[in-house]
Amino acid sequence: MAIQPPGSYPQGNKKGKAKKKSGQNAFARKEWYTLRSPSIFPNNINGKTLMTKSAGKNSYMNMIGRRYDVNQADLTGNNDVGHRKFIFKIGDIKGSECVGFFDGMELTSDKHKAMIKKWHTLIEAQKDIVAKDGSVFRVFVMGVTRRHPGYVKKTCYVKHSDEKKIRKIMFDVIEEELSGCDVQKIMKKLANETVGKRIEELGSEIFPLQNCCVRKVKTIKSHQTASVGQQEAIDAITN
């Protein structure tokens, strides 16, 4: 058997062999798109997102359906509402602008946990509502009992019968305030906490309540289009 010269033997362990780095920049094939939320908010430009360049004619369609969330304090400039964030889904693209449609709302985890109190009763309810355009949203609300003046007991629990009455009020308020409204009006009511204030007002007639609010809104079925609730934002881009 002939002896091969040094360096001609096959590499036994290729894991430790360093790969040659190419000089190509990873961001050279990326495109930047601006994220734009609905026009009802004062600050409706919410940053940028990346997409890899493609040779396809409709390569921008890869962006459709991408979800992102924005804190309400960034949307309105008011830090007092920084405990709430809105979720948007990219539904239309005009040039380098991505128009986001409403896709849900949620409280921040620290705010949600801070509202739940020991020795109190937590009352929760959820109900599906149908918007004007046929979109279906599932609304989650909550409320916590409150000690009224002169209350001396350590615990502040509500009777089960009164809890059922308060939950019935929650269902009725969700139906009255949100059902049948267009999506923009729903977003305004969520931003102003109209539902939570109404629940606290009516429910306190049965038992004192506090921290009543819409905890979460989840999209079940969306029929939003560029002509429903978003035309103003698109016109602002094209003009």
UniProtKB/Swiss-Prot annotation:
It is found in: Cytoplasm. Pfam families: Ribosomal_S3Ae. Residues 1-24 are annotated as: Disordered. InterPro entries: Ribosomal_eS1, Ribosomal_eS1_euk. GO terms for biological process: translation. One of its GO terms (molecular function) is structural constituent of ribosome. One of its GO terms (cellular component) is cytosolic small ribosomal subunit. SMART domains: Ribosomal_S3Ae (SM01397). Keywords: Cytoplasm, Ribonucleoprotein, Ribosomal protein. Component of the small ribosomal subunit. Mature ribosomes consist of a small (40S) and a large (60S) subunit. The 40S subunit contains about 33 different proteins and 1 molecule of RNA (18S). The 60S subunit contains about 49 different proteins and 3 molecules of RNA (25S, 5.8S and 5S). Belongs to the eukaryotic ribosomal protein eS1 family. This is Small ribosomal subunit protein eS1. It comes from Encephalitozoon cuniculi (strain GB-M1) (Microsporidian parasite). The gene is RPS1.
